[in-house]
């Protein structure tokens, strides 16, 4: 057949039963009404489209699709056609057979990050219905496997949008590169009520037992977040007693727990009244609402199950600790015993003290719920209920039961603290650039100022680790950087645990409070001090909350290595689904930067698009920063230029042209290797670069080395040199290796606290452990960028390697040749389905959304090819939409021989465009007393067919 008929009909004018024999039909009498001439995307969840939830964009990007009827990979046909083209002839017993590169095809499919969870309806005529805003596209089941949605956020003329390559925006969000950061802060726990008991004139005095001394405050005054009472308390001039109270956020949850408690007490403590699963769900809800850092959700299923068993045990009357808790007299109460048993169960599950920073919601929620009743939980357990931590949980935590911990970490992006409220917060300053020479390089030097504390590597502790390293090789699970640092140790100090009321009810601040801590290896100076809330919470996260605090944009974040001293938040806010909403002010801030016009198509201060302004600027700026560091790490010498000076770090423009051409982080990684080691000033294709990284990360040693030797032979030779290091310059290659293993937008680390080896160019060269995902979930380049800043000068590079240096090389080679650190389990339903979510959200920040579905019509004769039939709205001209869709067929563009693009408006206006081997006519069709329009698609000389094209291609 040379003709293909597409009915365009209204069911009010003709029943579909008369048209159901057509492979494709368009029903126009079911629409979602426009709002202000734009699509009402808020209606997507209740429509048969794709599964995008009606939640905030932050929640939507972490959401797992729940209501869908299967998935579709938009570029699946493109991939399978390429695999078909690349088949190789193989001899077999049956003669010559053609074999497909199944491994490549599987990788290409798995590498797609634009999977669509479909919500479709199958009608009474077995047609699969794909709903659009202006119509419903009905496809026969035999042809439905190639149908997918194509969403496109429209260009805002004022913002000069360029919405091509939105994969880059998605990749930045996945690798935490599109996130701003704000300093960490602490405030008095909202689950505590601090009530004044006595006062003193100065900290030299002691509080006499039973004496209620009054100086400035009335006994019984509540300590709030500001005012004289707060000031005197944090100055350790007020003695307080603590009682629990319920924060507003969890009033309903605590009420439900108290109902269960009352039922349990009234039933004479019958354990059957305690339903562990229900308790665990309520406690998890509390833990999630009272989260003090914004981080990746933890999978708590296994731990939750253990917790439920512990709850069952503790509420049994025969349990020894249950008996002991009930044998304790006043001031113990039955109401308190309920929460005491919950806290003990949580502690046994954790096998240690539970803190507010616990990553598991159910345990964190158990602690907070108990605080609302008991005040300081572990102090009350010991003093009132005569229960103490078990010795086998660690002796160091038992003495802490004498203290009461009154401060908790807060997330300033989410905190509801009011202007004027007092907090304790961290200041975080980065070392600026310095001038040096090629002969000296840029090494990690300790140059502290007067009065500064210093955090650096302890030579004694490091020697112990080095001995273990030489004897047993690299231990990625047990080598920790914090274990070799001096005090105050920036990787372990925690104000929430270090500030407390001691046994004499005196408020104690840590020795490092209000002092600068300098750490040259982190290029940072930090200081924790008192502060004041200067602005109210706002929906836009670009909001510096503390008067002398800090907030940094995505382009600045890689330099901030110590993740526990700040919180991060994606530079998008508002609803995932909205007709029109405001974008973050961070993009206006970025547009004011001096290099913004150079790296984007905007003038300084322009109103910018979050993608073509924010995402492109972020990627390009970070790429230049990374390139600048790695150029200095080149193992090559600078003959004749040893005395030349340069400023480091500084961003040059030598590679700017190539970086402006990049579309993906994998291209940047390959370019760094190619430019520095291969002397190639050229850019690899994005698919080739992604494939290389995938193979390096996933293959074992022999194949991994083969891939490197083919892709980058000079780099491979330097890598192999690590087995026999001769000069210091041979070690430089080690710090390039994290690039290959720790960055990709669709990987997950095997464990987020494993450590990879990197060289620290200190006064003495050290091989140090860099944890890939610890400290507030750093990811990708943030985990190691800081250490790429240091590099040896030519004088150091020329030096012969000693035995320790040779060990560094061999240890690093053995680790990186075999590591599987990038092969953790990816949460595929979440990671792979977010491109359309971002497109729809971006449409609300720009000029709205255009939607369409794409249907593939196979052609069987005289040559095998495909024709694309696109049905969409009238927000785009049909020929423009045609070009957009065809451009996605990267591998198999030669097989797309024709396109039919049908546009339908809200008033049923019909426009059609055709190109290639196809022609079209719009005709009237009459059946009995009914009529409709049809798009008659003609292919002179060609015969369409092959309904099972996709099935065949996936099984070649």
Curated annotation (Swiss-Prot):
Gene Ontology BP, a term: clathrin-dependent endocytosis of virus by host cell
Keyword terms, alphabetized: Capsid protein, Clathrin-mediated endocytosis of virus by host, Host-virus interaction, Inner capsid protein, Viral attachment to host cell, Viral penetration into host cytoplasm, Virion, Virus endocytosis by host, Virus entry into host cell
Function as written in the Swiss-Prot or TrEMBL entry: The VP2 protein is one of the two proteins (with VP5) which constitute the virus particle outer capsid. It is the major target of the host immunogenic response. Responsible for viral attachment to target host cell, probably by binding to sialic acid. This attachment induces virion internalization predominantly through clathrin-dependent endocytosis.
Keyword Transcription annotated: no
Gene from which this protein is expressed: Segment-2
Entry's family note: Belongs to the orbivirus VP2 family.
The name this protein goes by in its record: Outer capsid protein VP2
GO molecular function: structural molecule activity
Signal peptide: none
Stored InterPro entries: Capsid_VP2_Orbivir
Record carries keyword Mitochondrion: no
Subcellular localization: Virion
GO cellular component: viral inner capsid
């Amino acid at each position: 057949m040379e003709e293909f008929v597409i009915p365009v009909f209204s069911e009010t004018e003709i029943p579909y039963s008369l048209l159901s024999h057509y492979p494709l039909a368009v029903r126009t009498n079911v629409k979602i009404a426009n709002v202000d001439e734009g699509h009402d995307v808020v209606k997507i969840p209740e429509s048969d489209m794709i599964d995008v939830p009606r939640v905030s964009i932050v929640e939507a990007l972490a959401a797992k699709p729940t209501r869908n009827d299967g998935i579709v990979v938009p570029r699946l046909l493109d991939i399978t056609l390429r695999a078909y083209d690349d088949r190789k002839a193989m001899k077999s017993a049956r003669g010559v057979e053609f074999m497909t590169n199944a491994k490549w095809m599987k990788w290409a499919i798995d590498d797609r990050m634009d999977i669509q969870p479909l919500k479709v309806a199958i009608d009474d005529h077995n047609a699969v219905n794909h709903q659009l805003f202006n119509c419903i596209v009905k496809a026969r089941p035999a042809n439905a496997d190639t149908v997918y949605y194509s969403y496109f956020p429209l260009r805002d003329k004022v913002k000069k949008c360029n919405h091509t390559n939105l994969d880059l925006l998605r990749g930045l969000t996945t690798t935490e590169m599109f996130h701003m950061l704000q300093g960490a802060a602490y405030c008095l726990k909202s689950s505590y009520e601090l009530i004044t008991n006595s006062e003193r004139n100065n900290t030299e005095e002691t509080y006499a037992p039973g004496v209620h001394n009054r100086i400035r405050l009335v006994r019984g005054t509540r300590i709030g977040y500001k005012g004289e009472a707060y000031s005197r308390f944090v100055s350790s001039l007020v003695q307080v007693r603590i009682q629990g109270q319920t924060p507003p956020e969890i009033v309903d949850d605590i009420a439900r727990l108290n109902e269960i408690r009352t039922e349990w007490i009234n039933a004479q403590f019958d354990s059957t009244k305690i339903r562990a699963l229900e308790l665990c769900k309520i406690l998890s809800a509390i833990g999630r609402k009272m989260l003090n850092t914004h981080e990746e959700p933890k999978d708590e299923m296994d731990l939750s199950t253990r917790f439920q068993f512990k709850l069952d045990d503790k509420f049994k009357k025969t349990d020894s600790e249950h008996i002991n808790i009930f044998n304790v007299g006043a001031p113990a109460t039955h109401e308190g015993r309920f929460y005491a048993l919950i806290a003990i169960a949580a502690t046994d599950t954790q096998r240690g003290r539970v803190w507010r920073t616990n990553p598991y919601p159910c345990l964190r929620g158990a602690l907070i719920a108990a605080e609302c009743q008991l005040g300081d939980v572990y102090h009350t357990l010991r003093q009132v209920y005569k229960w103490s931590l078990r010795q086998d949980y660690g002796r160091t935590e038992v003495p802490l039961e004498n203290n009461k911990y009154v401060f908790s970490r807060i997330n300033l992006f989410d905190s509801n603290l009011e202007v004027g409220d007092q907090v304790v917060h961290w200041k975080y300053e980065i070392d600026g650039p310095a001038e040096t020479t090629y002969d000296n390089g840029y090494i990690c030097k300790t140059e502290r100022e007067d009065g500064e504390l210093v955090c650096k590597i302890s030579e004694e502790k490091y020697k112990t680790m080095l001995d273990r390293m030489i004897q047993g090789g690299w231990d990625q699970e047990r080598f920790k950087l914090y274990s070799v640092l001096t005090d105050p140790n920036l990787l372990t100090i925690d104000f929430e645990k270090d500030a407390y009321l001691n046994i004499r009810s005196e408020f104690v601040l840590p020795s490092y409070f209000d002092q600068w801590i300098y750490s040259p290896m982190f290029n940072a100076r930090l200081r924790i001090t008192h502060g004041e809330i200067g602005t109210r919470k706002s929906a836009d996260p670009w909001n510096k909350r503390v008067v002398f605090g800090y907030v940094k944009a995505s382009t600045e974040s890689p330099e901030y290595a110590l993740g526990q001293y700040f919180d991060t938040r994606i530079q998008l806010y508002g609803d995932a689904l909205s007709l029109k909403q405001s974008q973050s002010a961070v993009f206006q801030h970025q547009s004011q930067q001096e290099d913004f016009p150079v790296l984007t198509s905007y003038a300084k201060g322009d109103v910018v698009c979050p993608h073509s302004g924010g995402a492109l600027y972020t990627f390009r700026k970070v790429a230049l920063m990374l390139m600048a560091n790695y150029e200095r790490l080149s193992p090559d010498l600078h003959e004749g230029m040893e005395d030349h000076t340069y400023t480091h770090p500084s961003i040059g423009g030598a590679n700017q042209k190539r970086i402006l051409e990049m579309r993906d982080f994998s291209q940047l990684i390959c370019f760094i290797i190619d430019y520095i080691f291969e002397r190639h000033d050229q850019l690899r294709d994005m698919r080739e670069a992604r494939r290389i990284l995938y193979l390096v990360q996933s293959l074992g040693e022999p194949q991994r080395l083969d891939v490197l030797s083919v892709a980058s032979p000079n780099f491979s030779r330097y890598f192999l040199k690590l087995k026999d290091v001769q000069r210091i310059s041979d070690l430089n290659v080690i710090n390039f290796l994290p690039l290959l293993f720790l960055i990709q937008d669709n990987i997950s680390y095997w464990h987020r606290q494993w450590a990879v080896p990197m060289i620290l160019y200190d006064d003495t060269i050290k091989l140090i452990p860099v944890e890939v995902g610890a400290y507030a979930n750093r990811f990708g380049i943030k985990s190691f960028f800081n250490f790429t800043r240091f590099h040896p000068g030519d004088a150091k590079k020329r030096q012969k390697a000693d035995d320790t240096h040779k060990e560094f090389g061999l240890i690093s080679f053995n680790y990186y040749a075999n590591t599987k650190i990038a092969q953790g389990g990816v949460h595929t339903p979440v990671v792979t389905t977010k491109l359309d979510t971002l497109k729809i959200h971006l449409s609300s920040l720009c000029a709205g959304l255009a939607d369409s579905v794409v249907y593939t019509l196979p052609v069987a004769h005289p040559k095998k090819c495909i024709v694309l039939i696109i049905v969409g709205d009238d927000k785009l001209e049909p020929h423009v939409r045609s070009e957009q869709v065809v451009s996605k067929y990267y591998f198999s563009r030669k097989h797309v021989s024709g396109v039919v693009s049908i546009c339908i408006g809200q008033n049923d206006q019909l426009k059609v465009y055709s190109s290639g081997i196809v022609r079209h006519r719009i005709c009237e069709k009459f059946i009995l007393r009914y009529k409709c329009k049809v798009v008659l698609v003609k292919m002179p000389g060609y015969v369409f067919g092959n309904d099972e094209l996709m099935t065949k291609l996936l099984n070649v």
